[in-house]
Amino acid sequence: MHSATIGVIGGSGLYAMPDLKNPEEVRLTTPFGDPSDAFIIGELEGRRVAFLPRHGRGHRLNPSEVPARANIYAFKLLGVRALISVSAVGSLREDYAPGHAVIPDQIFDRTKGIRPATFFEGGVVAHVAFDRPFCPYLSNILLHAAQAAGAVVHQGGTLVVMEGPQFSTKAESEENRRRGHSLIGMTALPEAKLAREAEIAYATLAMVTDYDVWHPEHDAVTAEQVIKVLSANVNLSQQIVRHAVAQIDENFTSPAHDALRYAIVTHPDHIPAAVKERLAPIAGRYWS
């Protein structure tokens, strides 16, 4: 069985990690379907890393179609304990400019409830804590990694996750700004929630591509603009990830690693055997 302790999930513009040594393509299947694509597993800075393009190679999956449960479940099967998410985002703040990197510390859900957002269903219920959606340890590493890579980087801010795939209206953008949010994207949820349920530490490297549609001196966001900025910064994203991987202590502990300890409220005797089998890689230690 292939394994890795660190995972990287690449968003728009980051479809490969050419710095991986001895890369192997690994296809996995899960009880929740197939992941977005094959994993590329190799060595980076002396560590085993599993990379997955969130939208699939060729960008085939829109944000609502990304199989987040299959993706996170597969990372868990590989033994991943630390997951770095790289995402393209729009900025809702003047000082978070296109080309900058941001390490958000909060998240706000404005998806429409059409994306499956939990592993715990069909006879088992769990309520994980999610007050701090991003792992502080990994977020701090990403901050220092971005600085080491020479990026203009900002620490903190709330990332709003919208359903998409259309961009915001001006009214939506202005409302998000009035609420004090900093960034807007389409893919961090339910990914971050599922990572917490899978007891995987998770943090986001948000790469700003545009000012959404609120800025009076900038054109409204377009897909062409997003890809143009991402293409200009893909090497920077890869360098930040490389620096981050080098700093991660593979034996680190995070509150996320015990997120299910008091979260499963269904008594083991009442959980169907098929559900226990399906969730064994995620929660089996709590009812074995």
Curated annotation (Swiss-Prot):
<feature type="binding site">
    <location>
        <begin position="210"/>
        <end position="212"/>
    </location>
    <ligand>
        <name>substrate</name>
    </ligand>
</feature>
<dbReference type="GO" id="GO:0005829">
    <property type="term" value="C:cytosol"/>
</dbReference>
<dbReference type="GO" id="GO:0006166">
    <property type="term" value="P:purine ribonucleoside salvage"/>
</dbReference>
<keyword id="KW-0808">Transferase</keyword>
<comment type="pathway">
    <text>Amino-acid biosynthesis; L-methionine biosynthesis via salvage pathway; S-methyl-5-thio-alpha-D-ribose 1-phosphate from S-methyl-5'-thioadenosine (phosphorylase route): step 1/1.</text>
</comment>
<dbReference type="InterPro" id="IPR010044">
    <property type="entry name" value="MTAP"/>
</dbReference>
<dbReference type="GO" id="GO:0019509">
    <property type="term" value="P:L-methionine salvage from methylthioadenosine"/>
</dbReference>
<comment type="subunit">
    <text>Homohexamer. Dimer of a homotrimer.</text>
</comment>
<feature type="site" description="Important for substrate specificity">
    <location>
        <position position="168"/>
    </location>
</feature>
<feature type="binding site">
    <location>
        <begin position="54"/>
        <end position="55"/>
    </location>
    <ligand>
        <name>phosphate</name>
    </ligand>
</feature>
<feature type="site" description="Important for substrate specificity">
    <location>
        <position position="223"/>
    </location>
</feature>
<feature type="binding site">
    <location>
        <position position="186"/>
    </location>
    <ligand>
        <name>substrate</name>
    </ligand>
</feature>
<protein>
    <recommendedName>
        <fullName>S-methyl-5'-thioadenosine phosphorylase</fullName>
        <ecNumber>2.4.2.28</ecNumber>
    </recommendedName>
</protein>
<feature type="binding site">
    <location>
        <position position="12"/>
    </location>
    <ligand>
        <name>phosphate</name>
    </ligand>
</feature>
<dbReference type="InterPro" id="IPR000845">
    <property type="entry name" value="Nucleoside_phosphorylase_d"/>
</dbReference>
<comment type="similarity">
    <text>Belongs to the PNP/MTAP phosphorylase family. MTAP subfamily.</text>
</comment>
<comment type="function">
    <text>Catalyzes the reversible phosphorylation of S-methyl-5'-thioadenosine (MTA) to adenine and 5-methylthioribose-1-phosphate. Involved in the breakdown of MTA, a major by-product of polyamine biosynthesis. Responsible for the first step in the methionine salvage pathway after MTA has been generated from S-adenosylmethionine. Has broad substrate specificity with 6-aminopurine nucleosides as preferred substrates.</text>
</comment>
<dbReference type="InterPro" id="IPR018099">
    <property type="entry name" value="Purine_phosphorylase-2_CS"/>
</dbReference>
<feature type="binding site">
    <location>
        <begin position="87"/>
        <end position="88"/>
    </location>
    <ligand>
        <name>phosphate</name>
    </ligand>
</feature>
<keyword id="KW-0328">Glycosyltransferase</keyword>
<dbReference type="InterPro" id="IPR035994">
    <property type="entry name" value="Nucleoside_phosphorylase_sf"/>
</dbReference>
<dbReference type="GO" id="GO:0017061">
    <property type="term" value="F:S-methyl-5-thioadenosine phosphorylase activity"/>
</dbReference>
<keyword id="KW-0660">Purine salvage</keyword>
<feature type="binding site">
    <location>
        <position position="187"/>
    </location>
    <ligand>
        <name>phosphate</name>
    </ligand>
</feature>
<dbReference type="Pfam" id="PF01048">
    <property type="entry name" value="PNP_UDP_1"/>
</dbReference>
